[in-house]
Amino acid sequence: MPDDRMFTDAEALLVTRNAQSLEHPGGTLLEHLRRVGEQLADWGASREVQLAGLCHAAYGTDGFPVSLLDLEQRGTLRNAIGMQAEELVYLYAGCDRGQVYPQLDQAAACFDDRFTGLRTQPDRKSLRAFVEITAANELDVVRNSSALAAEHGLRPRGLSQ
């Protein structure tokens, strides 16, 4: 990941919210978040997508219900990583995976926000960013949890880096 103030501020915020103390496949949540951000950087994702990947679990997710920040604190994250990256974090966190994932092979997808119940249709750029963050997240989880990989019929060592 690029070495600049926003990445430093984002990681400092995650540390103040104890991400380094929460267990996650492959170590701690903070380690997972770093790996997701690094994977996105390796893939050449935009700076905003990398920042969103680094912070993707800030509000919890459909698969990881622990939140580091309350939704009322969106401004705190926005100040650290910028508006566009924070909006991607919210999109990722608010995603009802069971509703959204089956649509990801389509040019457009409707998202039911699990926080508000509202339905939205992200623009193509946001949808692409969501898919990139999702792929980086899921790859990291199965690489670091043989039980989850086996549950989904995957062999983590066989996944491309």
Label each residue range with its predicted role.
Residues 1-19:
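Membrane topogenic helices and adjacent juxtamembrane segments
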Residues 16-23, 29, 36-158:
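Divalent metal-dependent catalytic cores for phosphoryl transfer on phosphate-bearing substrates
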